[in-house]
Amino acid sequence: MTRLMLIINPAAGRGGFRNGLGDALNLLDKGGCRTTLFFTSGRGDATEFAAKYGADFDIVGCVGGDGTLSEVLAGLMRLENPPKVGYIPMGTANDVATTLGLPKNDTVSAARRILN
């Protein structure tokens, strides 16, 4: 079973993560992921979560926008052997997702990419 950490910014995209999150979590579960959720409540939380707990997981996923992704990556850069990164873009601009051609504000499609 794949250990997946999902760091969720509930303020990203005006809280749009709620739409489809349950379906995405069900898909991840059926795909063999044991998912643990971490919710941010302020600036820097995603960095600290990733740095403190990231090494305990096979994949660290980010549910949020460009800022949340940046924080997660900053935290993972502190680790000697960082895990793989998954991204469920749910921000307002999602510039990173646009550049990489990732589905935006579509939790289920993004969850499928994490499984692959």
Stretches with model-predicted labels:
Residues 2-116:
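Small-residue-rich beta-alpha loop regions that form the catalytic core of phosphotransfer
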